[in-house]
């Protein structure tokens, strides 16, 4: 046995786990772009003149297919590698929130709007009566980076962070982050399409500010597509994420210590947007709860009804809780007293017990909804049990575990 076989197996296992964690659409885009580059490499196809985004060819010969072929072809190994490495984290987060079908629609929409903006700006530069700049009309652009710049703007706008790190070297304000990347890539790399990246940024801001809302169909449209018979083979795949009818501008998890902003896309507003389209139970006294301990409160070993108003509390219980809990003897005494109190009311306990047993097991429908959002089934069952079958609280628990 070779001495490094354990290390090789460990790396292979970690790569497999990383790949299995990437949702269906994001991994499909990575595979498609990688396979296309490999085919071009093996066949020696390196001109890309027939598939690139060429404004002059689109206008003169109406080759609209270039809108979409240009984004899946790449010119070099580093080109496709960097683009796909940037796509995996952003695409995975967006797909887990939106669903696979909705993200596919958004990708096609961004590809279309990027191309239209690119075409308009190139036409204005090439055919204006003041100063004609023909270079943009004959620029042959390829690559997925235009879509990536749109995703960067959307993710930055929705996350609510106030600053972003540029390659781990320095921090910049979140609103300037896409523009800093645009300048950095233009200065550090050759043969970079400035107009293609610029149009991606403009499309991302247009989507973030709601200018594309009239182009985004309702949740019933995506549900109809998912219920089609020809989609069954895709839906059965474990990495496919169902569209749950949510707002495409819903919460995107971030990992920043400062998560506050004055814009309308703050984390709190985004979380309320996510919870608004989840099934809700009847209204409860959520406003009186301590924000540090979300969810329904439960009093152990007591005859009180758990659904009783929060104002009707036991004064003796409050007194015991306010005492110094550092002594083990006091803790044990409080436990014995609480158990003794519960034994004095066996009839009331018997009345409460059937009501609590009815909510022990989470319904299969609730489990399937959370599994369809990309969460692990075992974690879903544990979260639902901890949240007392409250989907909103269960989602909050699962998202905090992922963070």
Swiss-Prot record:
Topology versus the membrane: Multi-pass membrane protein
Gene Ontology biological process terms in this record: proteolysis
Organism: Arabidopsis thaliana
Family: Belongs to the peptidase S54 family.
Name of the protein this chain belongs to: Rhomboid-like protein 15
Residue ranges occupied by any UBA domain in the UniProt entry: 361-401
Function: Probable rhomboid-type serine protease that catalyzes intramembrane proteolysis. May function in senescence.
EC number: 3.4.21.-
Keyword Transport: no
UniProt region (Disordered), positions on chain: 282-316
């Amino acid at each position: 046995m070779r001495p490094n076989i354990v290390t090789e197996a460990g790396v292979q296992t970690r790569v497999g786990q990383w790949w299995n964690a990437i949702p269906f659409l994001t991994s499909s885009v990575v595979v498609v772009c990688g396979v296309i580059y490999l085919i071009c490499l093996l066949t020696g196809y390196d001109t890309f003149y027939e598939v690139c985004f060429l404004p002059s060819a689109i206008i003169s010969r109406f080759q609209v297919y270039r809108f979409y072929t240009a984004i899946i072809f790449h010119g070099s190994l580093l080109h496709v590698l960097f683009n796909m490495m940037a796509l995996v984290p952003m695409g995975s987060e967006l797909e887990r929130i939106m669903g696979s079908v909705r993200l596919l629609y958004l990708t096609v929409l961004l590809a279309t709007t990027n191309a239209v903006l690119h075409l308009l700006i190139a036409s204005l530069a090439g055919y204006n009566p003041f100063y004609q700049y023909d270079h943009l009309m004959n620029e042959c652009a390829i690559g997925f980076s235009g879509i990536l710049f749109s995703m960067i703007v959307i993710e930055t706008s929705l996350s609510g962070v106030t600053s972003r790190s540029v390659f781990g070297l320095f921090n910049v304000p979140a609103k300037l982050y896409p523009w800093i990347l645009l300048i950095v890539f233009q200065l550090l790399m050759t043969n970079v399409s400035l107009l293609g990246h610029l149009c991606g940024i403009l499309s991302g801001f247009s989507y973030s500010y709601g200018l594309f809302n009239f182009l985004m169909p309702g949740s019933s449209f995506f549900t109809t597509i998912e219920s089609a018979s020809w989609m069954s083979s895709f839906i059965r795949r474990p990495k496919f994420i169902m569209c749950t009818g949510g707002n495409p501008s819903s919460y995107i998890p971030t990992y920043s210590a400062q998560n506050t902003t004055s814009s309308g896309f703050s984390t709190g507003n985004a979380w309320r947007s996510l919870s608004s389209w989840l099934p809700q139970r009847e209204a409860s006294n959520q406003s009186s709860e301590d924000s540090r301990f979300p969810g329904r409160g439960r009093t152990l070993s007591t005859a009180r009804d758990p659904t009783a108003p929060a104002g009707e509390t036991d004064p003796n219980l409050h007194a015991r809780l306010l005492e110094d809990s550092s002594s083990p003897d006091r803790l044990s005494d409080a436990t014995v007293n609480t158990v003794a109190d519960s034994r004095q009311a066996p009839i009331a306990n018997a009345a409460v017990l059937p009501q609590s047993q009815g909510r022990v097991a989470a319904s299969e429908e609730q489990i399937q909804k959370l599994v369809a959002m990309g969460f692990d089934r075992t974690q879903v069952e544990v979260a639902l049990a901890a949240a007392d079958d409250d989907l909103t609280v269960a989602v909050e628990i699962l998202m905090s575990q992922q963070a």
